Amino acid sequence: MERSIVLAADVEADRARVFEVLSTTGGQRAFWTTDCDVSADKARFGFPQAPMDLLADVTTEPGKLVRMHVTSGFPFWTGSTWEWELREPARAETGTGVLFRHYGFAEGYAEIDLGHTAQTWAQIMERLAAYVASGSPQPFFPASS
């Protein structure tokens, strides 16, 4: 069985703003991890307790999609892809619908680990929604002290 994660949220911001946040270093630092660098075609994500960084190839469709394909990093993540697809909101009158997918984990990724990963991504999605609505950064992985 292929292991994948799918999450959805309607956020209180227009597509251009959500796309900017998802596709830039400043945006990613505001809701996910302060230790990152994102360019038009590459990204690096670091985490306080992780022994290695995640490196990813980035592809985008402005206003529609931000996709990151892992080229090296955590066990079972190399070769996986996460993406944010932007669309009309599904359950709100205004804003942007964000459909998040993470798929392509390596064979052997334990179901319990996938569950923990899904829970973490859900919390990161909440941070994204809060940031695009308020403009107040609250990264899930802040800088280590």
List PLM regions with ranges:
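Short, surface-exposed coil-to-beta transition loops
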Residues: S4-V6, P51-L55, W77-E83
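Short strand-connecting beta-turns/loops that link adjacent beta-strands
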Residues: D14, A50, E61-G63, P89-T94
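Short, flexible loop/turn segments with low-complexity composition
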Residues: G135-S145
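Beta-strand/loop substructures that line and gate deep hydrophobic ligand-binding cavities in soluble
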Residues: G73-Q123, L128-A130, P139-F141
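Hydrophobic pocket/interface hotspot
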Residues: V18-L22, Q28, A43-F45, D57, ...
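Glycine-rich portal/gate segments that line the openings of hydrophobic small-molecule binding cavities
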Residues: G26-F74
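Generic structural signal for secondary-structure transition and capping sites
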Residues: A16, G27, L65-V66, A133, ...
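Hydrophobic ligand-binding cavity/cleft-lining segments
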Residues: M1-D37
